[in-house]
Amino acid sequence: MKMNLPPFIELYRALIATPSISATDSALDQSNHTLINLLAGWFGDLGFHVEVQPVPGTLNKFNMLARIGEGKGGLLLAGHTDTVPFDDGRWTRDPFTLTEHDNKLYGLGTADMKGFFAFILDALRDIDPTKLTKPLYVLATADEETTMAGAKYFSESTQIRPDCAIIGEPTSLQPVRAHKGHMSNAIRIQGQSGHSSDPSRGVNAIELMHEAISHLLVLRNTLQERYHNPIFHIPYPTMNLGHIHGGDAANRICGCCELHMDIRPLPGITLNDLDGLLSEALEPVSQRWPGRLTISELHPPIPGYECPPDHRLVSVVEKLLGTKTEIVNYCTEAPFIQTLCPTLVLGPGSIEQAHQPDEYIDTKFIKPTRELISQVIHHFCHH
């Protein structure tokens, strides 16, 4: 059966050659169905039980869960199938053709992160499934780069409860055990426009926004005082007021003003908590000016994530790699997978290459990544 599997570089080539862009712009957004079917075929050839799941609320997007071995617990290896769009003018190579040059493999998704599936498949050639005493799961998700709809749906709907999970995002093989979340909102104030010669005939949205901002700055201080986690370089939740637009002329009362802001919560603060704090902070403005203030999401929010430092997954991986776990500033699917089991983010390639023109992975990662995957499968599925 394993003889059917193409060589490592051909697996990689086929993954990169199968476009799977996710984008908020529907003109650029693509289904990942072809890629999911490709993966499903390969894992099926290796004797895995494969399930392909449509992701509700998406346009033709799918998750794949492959399982081999029986029983409870085990290990989940996870990754996303989608890539960001590419800027044609800034790429010097074809994004969908795997190109090797100067010990680098170039292509869209080489580092972030379709290539991870080639590493998993390659490592599985040498593993005898009859020797597994616990199940090995491989999860391929949709839309990580936009809404994280695939990971969210999977974590809410699956029955599996592995002992632990590894998400193969490009961390240069440095294990990551925590990151903050991200929530971005638009605060919109609807005033009443009119000529500036008679202020009493209008409601100035800029003045109301000034009031709203003063309440937001109080909330910013509250977040800083109330929440603290020393593992982070900035040990409290941050708030940034990033963009504001209102009015159209000096001699007109401003009829509408909109502020875009973000909050980066620590692990342990739920998205519901944050929504509540934001609404509560702006409630005095809403009460004074009924119906004039609205809060909306700019992007789907992501909670913070932390894997307990004393979990066996952390000690095993730190020992295998001879390095300590790290904390990072970017967001991943880990908060959703962490609801099922302790999760680390750990994979080949550098985050510096993600979302860049001429994206690549250094070939120096090939051997250690293959070894690491074999070792963690052996450790968590053979005992």
Curated annotation (Swiss-Prot):
Active-site residues annotated for this sequence: D82, E144
Keyword Repeat: no
Cofactor binding remark: Binds 2 Zn(2+) or Co(2+) ions per subunit.
Primary localization class, coarse: cytoplasm
HAMAP family in the cross-refs: ArgE
Subunit structure and binding partners: Homodimer.
Name this protein carries in UniProt: Acetylornithine deacetylase
Native species: Pectobacterium carotovorum subsp. carotovorum (strain PC1)
